[in-house]
Amino acid sequence: MSMPVKTITTEKYQQNFSLAKYLEANVKAPLLWSSETPNLYIIVLTLKDHKGNVVEARSSRIGFRKVEFKNKHELCVNGKREYIYGVNRHDHDAWEGKTVPYERMVQDVTLMKRFGFNSVRTSHYPADPAFYDLCDEYGIYVMDEANVETCGADAELSNNELWLFAQMERVAGMVKRDKNHPSIIFWSLGNESGVGANNAARASWVKDYDPTRLVHFEAYMHNGGSRQYGYGIDFMKTNRPAVNPPEPPAVDVVSTMYPSVEGIIKLATQEGETRPVLMCEYAHAKGNALGNHQEYWNAVKKYPRLIGGYIWDWVDQSVIRKDSVTGKEYFSSLNGTNGLVFADRKIKPAINECKKIYQHIRFDYSNGELTIRNEYNYLPLSTFRFSWKLMAGGELIKKGAVSYTHLRA
């Protein structure tokens, strides 16, 4: 596939920065990319002069996948329904602070996969490009979030046209930089910056530039100390006429923060709204939290419009220091211990609860029979190794393994 540079440069545009041309080619039956099957290809772009000499060449890994909402509310990747088993992630390292080394990013992604997470939100700014490469490779869905936040000013700047360019520049920069990563399925316009015309403008640009992904924005405002959604309507009330956000065409999902289980059920069953409901922040993991995490997921699996959410958050924002007297190391933090893992990536008990709830292979024992149910979209049971133990009073009675040849998909 080739195109002469002259074909591009001779077309007339009013401004140079809008100079563009699309190259299109049909790829027959590619292996599709998903969180379960992160199949990647390498595309190579070569620029040659009029004599055929190579002037420049660039390569990039890409993946083929389709993201959509079927039946208006079912999140589907390649036609298969998906739930967001997600977590919010800040850039943080116990030794280097906000300068996160590559090996720590690898550790984050592998731990997320190990404990059943399939998605991450880059709260509240785009991540290091290397992090997206890892998500592409390992299979992690990404909500890529622009660094637009006016927490404390509520919607003041989102309704001020003087701030539109600054906000638009940050969103556009993120989308243009990260657009080739198959792991990114959501563009997020920012965080906690209220409802306003600037939000709608940013969303419109994103949808025009990249119609292949979904647009997210959780816009909340404060009123008398309580969270208010939509046109000042408390979403917990049963007579609410609108939900967050109030520009229905602008975003693809109703997003909420820290709702109760009853709250998300009310959002998911409200009349006059068909969009899916996502908890972009929930299950605040400070201390020994997540005690009712199962109840949230019982609701998610019961009510069709609920698609999951992102736990707050992944890693404690603390740094390792040495005691001046004893010389012992300790974690120093100013109230930033909200993570499922410690700052050095040692796990906390709550993350095991997540692994249990998110597991895609279910075991049901009744009437002397064990039923194994596979909830993966692409991975057959033969992909896994099964071992078992029979215990009585804490003592091992017998153990064994099940041959994968006897397991159906």
For each predicted feature, which ranges?
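Substrate-binding/catalytic cleft of secreted carbohydrate-active enzymes
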Residues: V109-M112, S119-L340
